[in-house]
From Swiss-Prot:
Function as written in the Swiss-Prot or TrEMBL entry: Part of the Tol-Pal system, which plays a role in outer membrane invagination during cell division and is important for maintaining outer membrane integrity.
Name of the protein in question: Tol-Pal system protein TolB
CC per GO annotation: periplasmic space
Compartments where found: Periplasm
PANTHER family: PROTEIN TOLB, PROTEIN TOLB HOMOLOG
Stored NCBIfam families: propeller_TolB (TIGR02800)
Species the sequence originates in: Rickettsia typhi (strain ATCC VR-144 / Wilmington)
Keywords: Cell cycle, Cell division, Periplasm, Signal
Subunit structure: The Tol-Pal system is composed of five core proteins: the inner membrane proteins TolA, TolQ and TolR, the periplasmic protein TolB and the outer membrane protein Pal. They form a network linking the inner and outer membranes and the peptidoglycan layer.
S-S bonds: none
Hydrolase among keywords: no
Main location: periplasm
A GO BP entry: protein import
Signal peptide: 1-18
Lineage start: Bacteria, Pseudomonadati, Pseudomonadota, Alphaproteobacteria, Rickettsiales
Length: 443
């Protein structure tokens, strides 16, 4: 995916300026008003590309919940492009704290050069500028890259817009057909990776975003783990693991993977060396141990286990030693997912109210004090589950289900929410959707 060339672009001095950043951990924040101006273009075709780039940048920033793009209908200044200093008073008049100017040009190579500058309209300073050289078909990724740069400059955290989501697509009509699908983080460029002839579950990205793994049931009793190369489309069977029901999760270095396998009435966590295919059993005793997830440094594994009666969350060293419980609230816990930052673990929690099951998505500290209940529920519903993290550890994606009504089957959709429990949004997909997995930022 190394098709984007990136350059820093500085036209005006930044000397002596320090920007106050947004910290979303402080709770709900007022979105920063930003004007994304029309991009200059060297042709009518590139004018259309520029308009599309502006739309993607604005949408990315709006989706984050931290920015409020201002409608172009209120713009006063008509000058566009990156080779002039804006009339800042005109932008302040429409309450734009930030201004984005840009341009799109075609190079002799046939590639597009997409440039931008981000301005602070009150201090009248350039904050950042950059240009991207991309094949024409990758203009959308360049727009995501620009939004990433803006997000990082203002928040201090890396952006997450130039990413992919792999998930299970579900037809809404009966009988339900499930297929592995891939899309941009915002739902664009959706494509199907499997044909729907077999039951498929739990797609996972490998060490990079170039490959995925998933479970497919060739028969009702036989599950196979498949590897699919997203560049070539080539697919191969990784293993025929009797008793496996979820795809493996991979270590940060890509050399190992963990999975749960049921044998002899118990389900245990196993680690596999991907080079030698050697399996190492990490848990013991009786009970069901499932949903392992590595810490960002690969030294720890979080998982859920019912060995003490009710499913709770536990952390152990990656060799299976030093097991300790980290969940202490009421209810049962499932599907833990370790934040890429290493500070939090997301989870599904099932509680009961008036005899009805309630599903919750929550987060807790990865390293709480002894018996500290550090968890915080951020959303609840009829069936919310399968949390996963954005690569910057600031947003959680999950699936939400609705029950069947009359002759209409139930449906599942994918949503995002920030770690404070605000800004819940649906990710639009062509059909039902569940089991999302978020890629790292693309190269």
């Amino acid at each position: 995916m190394r098709n984007i060339v990136y350059f820093i672009l500085t036209l005006f001095s930044l000397t002596g300026y320090a920007l106050e950043t947004i910290n979303i951990e402080h709770g709900r924040v007022d979105p920063t008003p930003i004007a994304v101006n029309k991009f200059n273009a060297d042709s009518s075709n590139n004018d259309l590309v520029g308009n599309a780039v502006v739309k993607v940048i604005s949408n990315d920033l709006k989706i984050s919940g931290l920015f409020r793009p201002i409608s172009s209908a209120s713009f006063i200044e008509e000058q566009t492009g990156i080779n002039y200093k804006p009339l800042f008073a005109a932008w302040r008049q429409i309450n734009a704290s930030l201004l984005v100017n840009g341009e799109v040009q075609t190079l002799e190579s046939g590639k597009l050069k997409i440039s931008f500058i981000l301005w602070d309209t009150f201090l009248e300073k350039q904050l950042i500028g950059a240009l991207f050289e991309v094949p024409t078909k990758l203009w959308r990724r360049a727009a995501h890259k620009i939004a990433d740069k803006i997000y990082e400059k203002i928040t201090g955290d890396p952006g997450y817009f130039d990413t992919k989501i792999v998930y299970v697509s579900e037809s809404t009509a009966l009988p339900k057909i499930k297929r592995i699908a891939l899309m941009d983080y915002d739902g664009a460029n959706n494509k199907y990776l499997t044909n729907g002839k077999s039951l498929v579950l739990t797609p996972r990205f490998a060490h990079s975003a170039d490959k995925i793994f998933y479970v497919s049931y060739a028969t009702k009793s036989r599950a196979l783990v498949y590897e699919k190369d997203l560049k070539t489309g080539k697919e191969s069977v990784v293993g025929d693991f009797v008793g496996i029901s979820f795809a493996p999760r991979f270590s940060p270095d890509g050399k190992k993977a963990v999975m749960s396998i049921a044998k002899n009435g118990s389900t245990h966590i196993y680690e596999i060396d991907l080079a030698t295919k050697q399996l190492n059993k990490l848990t013991d005793g009786f009970g069901i141990n499932t949903s392992p997830s590595y810490s960002p440094d690969g030294k720890k594994i979080v998982y859920n286990s019912d060995k003490n009666g009710v499913p709770q969350l536990y952390i152990m060293n990656s060799d299976g030693s030093d097991v300790r419980r980290i969940s202490f609230g009421g209810g049962s816990y499932a599907s833990p997912s370790w934040s890429p930052r290493g500070d939090y673990i997301a989870f599904t929690k099932i509680t009961r109210h008036d005899g009805e099951k309630i599903f919750n998505i929550g987060i807790m500290k990865a390293y709480p004090q002894d018996h500290e209940n550090s968890e915080r529920i951020i959303t609840s519903g009829y069936l919310v589950e399968s949390p996963c993290w954005s690569p910057n550890g600031r947003v959680i994606m999950f699936s939400k289900g609705w029950p069947s009504r009359a002759k209409a089957p139930g449906k599942n959709k994918i949503f995002t929410i920030d770690l404070t429990g605000h800004n819940e949004r649906e990710v639009i997909t062509p059909a039902g959707a569940s089991d999302p997995e978020w890629s790292d930022v693309l190269n």
